[in-house]
Amino acid sequence: MDQIARRAETNERMLYYYFGSKEQLFTAVLEHAFTALTDAEKSLDLEGVAPVEAVTQLAHFIWNYYREHPELLRLVNNENLHEARYIKGSTRIRELISPVVAKLAKILERGQQAGLFRNNVDPLRFYITLSGLGYYIVSNRFTLEATFGLDFSADAERDEIIKMNTELLLAYLMRR
């Protein structure tokens, strides 16, 4: 708390006054990070976009967000080390994820009605898969580079992974 207070140019007592505890402060930080992601996702208007292009734009948007905001992934990784202790205590975070899943559900439904997408696609599971494809490369970029000698934060590598991940998602979605 002392380091946080110094960086915020305040004192520990003020932090405890506003947040109550280290745990409540961390929960507030998580909620803030997820709110920023949700606000960014809300700005993405995919209503009139063809379903295949809408899924592609949503995926690229999320993956680019992760790349531009690796602090979100660090927070989530830290939370996973704590077995989601703080997220479990926050109803707000669960509520924040719902709008993008609802947006994706509408896109999937439009694609199904157009005869493009399979009918048995669960929006939440698809979102988790979509998210995971972008998450892994950003979250693990340092160990991937050390292990394989490839810098996945470099534009050329990133573009190749995005292309492959997009093809994977669409291959799963498309009616066979």
How does the language model describe each region?
Residues 61-64, 68, 98-114, 132-176:
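C-terminal peripheral helix-coil segments that are non-catalytic and often amphipathic
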Residues 1-24, 28:
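Helix-turn-helix
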Residues 7, 24-47, 53, 57-64, ...:
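Alpha-helical structural segments
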Residues 38, 118, 172:
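Ligand-binding pocket scaffold of soluble enzyme catalytic domains
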Residues 27, 31, 35, 64, ...:
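Generic alpha-helical structural context detector
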